[in-house]
C-alpha cells in the first residue's frame, strides 16, 4: 500500500478544521438561496435532471455507439447507444470504465517542457518553432483513423511543410485483410453472421475479448449458440489455449501451437473430397489430408474427419481465424487456409459477408520499422505522438525508445504513459468525452463523437485537433482557411455526407438529428465474393520459433486491460479476470502436468526467459493450455502510466522478437521460453475461493437431450426443499407486485461488463490489491467461475452472483438495529445511517454478497 493520509484521519482533520472555520466565521452574514421553482423557458439546463448525449466510444477500434448520462454538466454513466446498429445499446467492460479516462487524476493537467510545467502560450510557441525548424522532416505517429481525423492530419502535415503519418495499433487486423485480398480479392474485414451459422469453428480467435467488435460478436454469437426451438448449435474451439472465448465452446480441440492452418486445410480436404467443389483445390488439399497433418498438429486423423462431418451435417459453417495466439510468422498463410475452409464448406456469402466499402485504416509494424530506421538515420527532426503508447507496447528488441530519443518529441496525449514520459514537450489533449470527432467503422455506419461535458476544470487541456489547427495557422497563414476550429472542419465533412445520403434538409436540422441519433446508420450493402485460384499456391510451413528448446510462449490479450491502455483505470484492475480470478497482477498459465514435471507449484514465482529478455511471473495452473506451451496476458508491467498502473505485473512484450509476418504485422508467437523456479510462493491475489463446486450444484448445467424430457430433475430443476418454511403471509404480502430478475446463464459469457457497470452506477470504492487479499473488496456483483472435470476434457461455468433479495433473508433477521429490511416490493433495502457495523448480515448471508465499507 502507498503511504499517505488515511480516510479516517482525513475526517478527523476535517472535523477540527470545520469547527475552527465556524468559530472564525461566526460573524459572517448568511447568504440566502433562491430556489428556482419556476425555471425560465429558455433555460438550457435544469438542476437535478439527467441528460443523455450520443457519442462514440474510443476505448478500442470498434467505435461502438455510446450514450452518456450527465447531471449538473458532469458525465455520470456510460451506456451503449440503442440506436447504433453495431452494439445496439450494449457496452463492454472497457467502455463502461471509460469514464475513468475522463476523471483520471493522473491526466496531464498542464503543458510540460522537459518535465516542467509551462504556460500554454510558451508551449505553442515551442511547437511552432520546432515545426518551422523541421522543414518538413516531420513524422506523426497515431492510432489508425476510422473517420475524418486521418484526412485532417494529412492536410495538417501538408500545411506544416510536409511529413508522413504513421499508424500504430498493437492489435491490428492487417494480416487478416491481406489474407482476404489473396483469397477473395477484398482487402477488407467482412461481417461475420454468427446467427446464420449452424456450427462455428474457432481457430484461436478471441472474438469475445479483443478481436473485431467484441460487443457485436457476443450478441450475434449468443443468438447462434443459445438453446432455442429444441436445439443448440455447436461451437468448437480449435486452439492450444482456452481463453474466455474458448470457455464457451462445446468442445476444445487441443492443437500444437501455430498449426491452426494445417487443421483448417485438413478439414477442408475431407469436405472437398465429399462435395467436389472447387476442383482446382483437389490436388492442393490432398497434401493436407488428415493422415498427413495428424502428427504435426497433434490431432488424430479420426478427430479431424469428425470435425469435417460436423461442418457438413450441422452447417452452415463459420470458421474464424486471427488473434494473438495464432500470430506466428505464418499468420497470413494460416488465415488463407481458414478462408479456404469457409469457401469449400459453402460459408462464403452466407456467414461471411463482404461489402464494397474501403477497409478502415490499419497499421503494420513494418511501417514502424521504417519509422525507427528514419529516426536513427536523422531523416526526421520532429516526432508527434497522440495517445498511443509505442514505448510500452512494442518489443524492446525493436529499439523504438532509443530511436525516439534522437529527435524532438511532442506528445499530444491526455493520459500519462511511457511514451509521454520520454517526450520533450507535452501538450495535454482532451479526452473523447470532451472533444469532437467521428468514426466510420464499417459499411453504412457513420458515428459522431461530441463533447458530452465541458473540460474538467482541474485539467488545462485542449482538443488535439484544435492544437494542430492553431499551430498550423501560426506557421502557414493559408492553412485551413475558413476553419476556426476542428468543429468547423468536421461540419464541412458532414455537409458532404449529407449530400451523399440525399438528405434535403438544411444543414442545421441535419446536424441536430445526427447529434441526437449518434450518427447516420444505413443498411449494409453486401457483394458476392468468390475464391481466387491463387490460394492453391499458398504453402504452410512450420512456424519459426526462436529458442532451440523450451515451451512455446503465447502472449494473450487481456479482456479488461486490452493492449495496456486500460491499466490506469482502478475498476479494470479491481475486477477479477474471468478465467483466473486474479486482480491487480499478471500470471503465467501452465498446464498442471507440465508444471509438476518441472517441479513448479501453483502460484510459485517463475523466471520466464526467451532469447530477447526475461521476467518473473506467477505460475497459474490451467488445464486449458497445451502441455508444451505457456500463456502470459498483456497489459500490465507499466512504469510511467499513473499510480494505478505502475508497479503491477509484468510486460510480456519484453520477451518477444522484432519479427514480422508477410503482412508486416508483429509476430506474437515466435519464441520459446525456459522456466526457472525462483520462489515457492508469490503474493498473487485471486477472489475465487474454490474453483470447484464440491457437489453443491451452485452453477447447474444440463444437456440438450435432457431438456427434451422435462420430467427429469436436471431438465425441470424441481424446487429444492427449503430450510425454513414459507412465510404465512407470502401469498398476499407483495401488493401489487414483487420485484424479480432472471439471468440466463446459457447466454452469460463471463465478459464482466455488468461488474464494471455496477462500480460505475453505484460509485463503489476500489480497495486495492492488499485489501482485496483479505476479503474487503466492495463489488456488489461478482462473476463466479467454476471448473468441472480435469485434463483436456474440463468445463468452465460462469455464474454472476449478486444480492438475491431473498424472501426470508438471513441478513434481515440478524441485524440488531434494523438497518436492512424487507420492503413491500420484495426488495432487500438498506438504511445506511442505521448501520453500526456489526457485520452480522455478512456472516449470515448464504450467497456472501453483503459488503462492508472498511474505509
List each model region and its residues.
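N-terminal export/assembly segments and adjacent metallocofactor-ligating motifs
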Residues: 1-274, 283, 291, 300-302, ...
Amino acid at each position: 500500500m502507498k503511504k499517505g493520509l488515511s480516510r479516517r484521519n482525513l475526517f478527523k482533520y476535517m472535523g477540527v478544521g470545520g469547527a475552527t472555520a465556524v468559530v472564525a466565521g461566526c460573524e459572517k452574514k448568511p447568504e440566502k438561496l433562491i430556489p428556482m421553482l419556476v425555471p425560465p423557458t429558455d433555460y438550457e439546463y435544469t438542476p437535478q435532471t439527467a441528460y443523455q448525449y450520443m457519442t462514440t466510444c474510443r476505448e478500442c477500434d470498434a467505435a461502438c455507439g455510446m450514450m452518456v448520462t450527465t447531471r449538473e454538466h458532469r458525465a455520470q454513466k456510460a451506456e451503449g447507444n440503442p440506436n447504433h446498429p453495431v452494439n445496439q445499446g450494449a457496452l463492454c467492460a472497457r467502455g463502461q470504465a471509460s469514464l475513468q479516462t475522463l476523471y483520471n487524476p493522473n491526466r496531464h493537467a498542464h503543458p510540460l517542457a522537459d518535465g516542467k510545467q509551462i504556460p500554454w502560450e510558451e508551449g505553442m510557441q515551442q511547437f511552432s518553432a520546432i515545426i518551422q525548424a523541421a522543414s518538413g522532416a516531420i513524422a506523426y505517429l497515431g492510432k489508425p483513423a476510422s473517420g475524418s481525423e486521418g484526412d485532417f492530419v494529412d492536410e495538417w502535415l501538408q500545411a506544416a511543410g510536409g511529413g508522413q503519418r504513421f499508424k500504430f495499433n498493437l492489435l491490428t487486423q492487417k494480416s487478416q485483410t491481406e489474407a482476404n485480398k489473396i483469397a477473395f480479392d477484398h482487402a477488407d474485414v467482412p461481417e461475420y453472421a454468427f446467427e446464420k451459422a449452424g456450427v462455428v469453428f474457432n481457430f484461436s480467435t478471441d472474438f469475445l475479448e479483443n478481436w473485431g467488435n467484441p460487443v457485436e460478436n457476443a450478441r450475434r454469437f449468443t443468438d447462434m449458440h443459445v438453446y432455442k426451438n429444441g436445439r443448440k448449435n455447436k461451437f468448437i474451439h480449435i486452439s492450444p489455449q482456452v481463453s474466455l472465448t474458448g470457455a464457451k465452446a462445446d468442445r476444445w480441440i487441443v492443437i500444437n501451437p501455430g498449426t491452426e492452418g494445417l487443421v483448417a486445410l485438413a478439414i477442408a480436404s475431407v469436405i472437398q473430397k465429399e462435395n467436389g467443389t472447387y476442383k482446382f483445390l483437389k490436388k492442393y488439399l490432398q497434401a493436407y489430408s488428415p493422415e498427413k497433418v495428424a502428427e504435426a498438429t497433434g490431432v488424430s486423423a479420426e478427430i479431424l474427419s469428425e470435425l469435417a462431418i460436423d461442418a457438413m451435417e450441422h452447417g452452415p459453417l463459420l470458421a474464424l481465424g486471427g488473434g494473438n495466439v495464432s500470430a506466428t510468422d505464418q499468420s497470413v498463410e494460416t488465415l488463407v487456409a481458414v478462408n479456404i475452409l469457409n469457401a469449400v464448406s459453402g460459408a462464403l456469402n452466407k456467414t461471411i459477408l463482404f461489402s464494397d466499402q474501403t477497409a478502415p485504416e490499419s497499421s503494420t509494424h513494418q511501417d514502424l520499422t521504417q519509422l525507427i530506421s528514419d529516426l536513427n538515420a536523422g531523416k526526421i527532426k520532429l516526432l508527434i505522438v497522440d495517445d498511443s503508447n509505442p514505448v510500452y507496447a512494442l518489443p524492446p528488441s525493436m529499439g523504438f525508445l532509443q530511436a525516439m530519443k534522437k529527435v524532438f518529441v511532442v506528445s499530444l496525449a491526455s493520459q500519462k504513459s511511457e511514451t509521454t514520459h520520454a517526450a520533450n514537450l507535452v501538450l495535454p489533449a482532451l479526452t473523447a468525452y470532451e472533444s469532437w470527432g467521428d468514426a466510420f467503422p464499417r459499411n453504412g455506419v457513420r458515428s459522431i463523437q461530441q463533447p458530452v461535458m465541458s473540460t474538467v476544470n482541474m485539467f488545462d487541456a485542449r482538443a488535439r485537433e484544435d492544437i494542430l489547427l492553431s499551430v498550423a495557422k501560426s506557421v502557414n497563414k493559408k492553412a485551413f482557411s475558413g476553419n476556426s476550429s476542428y468543429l468547423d472542419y468536421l461540419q464541412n465533412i458532414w455537409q458532404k455526407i449529407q449530400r451523399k445520403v440525399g438528405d434535403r434538409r438544411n444543414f442545421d436540422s441535419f446536424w441536430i438529428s445526427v447529434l441526437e441519433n449518434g450518427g447516420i446508420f444505413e443498411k449494409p450493402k453486401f457483394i458476392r465474393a468468390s475464391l481466387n485460384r491463387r490460394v492453391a499456391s499458398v504453402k504452410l510451413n512450420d512456424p519459426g520459433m526462436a529458442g532451440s528448446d523450451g515451451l512455446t510462449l503465447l502472449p494473450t490479450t487481456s479482456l479488461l486491460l486490452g493492449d495496456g491502455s486500460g491499466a490506469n483505470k482502478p475498476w479494470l484492475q479491481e475486477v477479477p479476470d474471468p478465467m483466473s480470478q486474479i486482480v491487480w497482477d499478471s500470471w503465467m498459465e501452465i498446464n498442471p502436468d507440465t508444471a509438476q514435471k518441472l517441479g513448479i507449484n501453483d502460484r510459485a514465482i517463475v523466471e520466464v526467459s526467451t532469447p530477447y529478455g526475461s521476467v518473473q511471473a506467477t505460475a497459474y495452473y490451467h488445464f486449458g493450455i497445451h502441455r508444451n506451451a505457456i500463456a502470459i496476458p498483456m497489459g500490465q508491467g507499466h512504469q510511467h502510466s499513473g499510480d494505478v498502473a505502475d508497479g503491477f505485473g509484468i510486460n510480456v512484450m519484453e520477451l518477444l522478437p522484432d519479427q514480422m509476418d508477410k503482412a508486416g504485422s508483429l509476430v506474437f508467437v515466435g519464441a520459446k521460453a525456459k522456466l526457472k523456479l525462483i520462489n515457492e510462493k508469490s503474493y498473487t491475489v485471486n477472489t475465487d475461493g474454490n474453483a470447484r463446486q464440491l457437489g453443491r450444484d451452485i452453477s447447474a448445467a444440463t444437456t440438450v437431450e435432457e431438456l427434451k424430457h422435462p420430467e427429469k430433475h436436471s431438465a425441470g430443476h424441481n424446487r429444492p426443499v427449503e430450510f425454513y418454511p414459507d412465510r404465512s403471509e407470502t401469498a398476499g404480502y407483495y401488493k401489487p407486485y414483487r420485484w424479480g430478475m432472471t439471468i440466463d446463464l446459457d447466454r452469460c459469457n463471463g465478459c464482466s461488463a455488468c461488474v464494471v457497470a455496477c462500480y460505475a452506477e453505484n460509485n463503489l470504492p476500489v480497495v486495492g490489491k492488499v485489501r482485496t487479499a483479505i476479503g474487503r473488496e466492495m463489488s456488489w456483483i461478482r462473476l463466479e467461475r467454476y471448473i468441472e472435470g480435469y485434463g483436456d476434457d474440463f468445463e468452465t461455468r460462469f455464474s454472476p452472483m449478486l444480492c438475491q433479495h431473498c424472501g426470508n433473508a438471513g441478513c434481515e433477521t440478524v441485524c440488531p438495529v434494523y438497518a436492512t429490511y424487507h420492503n413491500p416490493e420484495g426488495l432487500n433495502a438498506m438504511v445506511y445511517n442505521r448501520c453500526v457495523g456489526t457485520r452480522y448480515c455478512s456472516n449470515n448471508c448464504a450467497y456472501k454478497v453483503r459488503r462492508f465499507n472498511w474505509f
